[in-house]
Amino acid sequence: MEEINYKKVKAWPFVEALKIKNKISKVKSKNLIIFETGYGPSGNPHIGTFAEVLRTNMVRNCFKEISNIPTNLIAFSDDLDALRKVPEDYPFPEKLSEFIDSPLSSIPDFTRQYKSYADRNNNLLKDFLNRFDFDYKFISSTETYKSGRFDSHLLKILEN
């Protein structure tokens, strides 16, 4: 089988993967490349959510074709974001409307199946991604802040 010259491939995922490969060629340590997609769990995951994860994963897969560097895909939930409006498809709009401007992870889940409104939507996202066999790691901003994982970075920001 003839070897593909990926530098000549014009498909945008390969173009983006090559940009990443070229950029990291200047970095000494190349143990792992992380591809990340963000999700705002203010409502149910939808086709736009799927498209963002799919596009990121397409670039990741192309990167794996042109590189031997291991990769991870992270689905990062911005579940500390505030609720700006009540989604039209939510079953308890009158209850949810009382929590406008509240962090998504501090809003109760009115279906009583999850720890919070954000946890409900995060689980819907994970079910959605699992249905399509995405290889990813899920990270919640609420849990990341609570764990202290961001503390040293936040302190650096405050010092500058």
For the regions a language model picked out, list residue spans one by one:
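Non-catalytic terminal extensions that flank enzyme cores
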Residues: M1-I47, N61-A75, P87, P91-S97, ...
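Conserved aromatic-histidine-acidic binding/catalytic patches
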Residues: K8, S42-A51, Q113, Y117, ...
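Short, internal active-site loops enriched in acidic
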Residues: G40-P41, D78-A82, E143-K146
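N-terminal accessory alpha/beta regions
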Residues: N44, V53-R55, I74-N123
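Cysteine-centered nucleophilic/redox motifs
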Residues: E52-K64
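Active-site neighborhoods of enzyme catalytic cores
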Residues: S102-N160
